A protein has these predicted regions:
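Conserved catalytic scaffold of divalent metal-dependent phosphoesterases
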Residues: 15, 32-34, 95-196
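Short helix-capping segments at alpha-helix termini
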Residues: 19, 80-83, 116, 171
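A general structural motif
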Residues: 23, 53, 84, 173-175
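Conserved phosphate-interacting/catalytic interface
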Residues: 87
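Generic enzyme active-site microenvironment
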Residues: 28-29, 59-60, 90, 124, ...
Length: 198
């Protein structure tokens, strides 16, 4: 199993909406595929604690849709994270595949989503949550795309109007953070109106 990678970015959060004067930090997680780094994900959790974030942002594929999907490591990780931080989670293609293909996966996705929501995870399935940090309003959006947007070599074209059909319009009163699993569609995310896409 490959090790996890920590990359730090410093971004200036400012727009015509409002400047954020006080710095804050967020941890962004994606594509762990139910991996565990140390017993109970102890290495990953320690690295996250070292960053001292105000919130955790998750852009999917925390589990793997395989013939025998396992979600235990991801559920345990979410349980530890929600003890200390607010967690905002958007599905990736693996979660979506499990959700849609109930013939193959039965109720595995429903059990997974119920478990993480019961722990306090804000699961954003084409939805959003409003958050205020240092008196600045943020809206965190979770974009969930169907499998046609993830097929290798023949992906569907994503447009801002498709995103608007799924999410509605960005909140003009807030700084809009879009959690979207597929980075190739960044131009459509920007046209839709995301101030920051992850």
């Amino acid at each position: 199993m490959p090790d996890f990678k920590v990359t730090r970015y410093r971004l200036r959060i400012g727009s015509e909406k409002r400047d954020l004067e006080q710095p804050f930090s967020a941890v962004f997680l994606s594509d762990l595929h139910n991996a565990s780094y140390g017993e109970g994900n102890s290495r990953l959790l320690q690295e996250i604690r070292n960053e001292n974030p105000e919130l955790i942002l998750v852009a999917g594929d925390m589990i793997t849709a395989s013939s025998e999907p396992s979600t235990d490591a991801s559920i345990a990780l979410m349980g530890e994270l929600t003890k200390q931080y607010p967690v905002y989670y958007a599905n990736g293609n693996h979660e979506y595949r499990m959700k849609q293909n109930t013939d193959k996966y039965q109720d595995a996705y429903e059990r997974y989503s119920d478990a993480i929501k019961s722990l306090g995870v804000h699961l954003l399935e084409n939805g959003s949550a409003r958050v205020e940090l240092y008196k600045v309003p943020f809206r965190i959006w979770g974009l969930e795309l169907d499998q046609s947007y993830f097929r290798r070599g023949r992906t569907a074209q994503l447009t801002s109007s498709v995103i608007e059909g799924l999410l509605g319009k960005p909140d003009e009163q807030c700084y809009n953070i879009l959690l979207a699993h597929h980075p190739s569609y960044f131009p459509a995310y920007a046209v839709w109106g995301a101030d920051l896409s992850l």
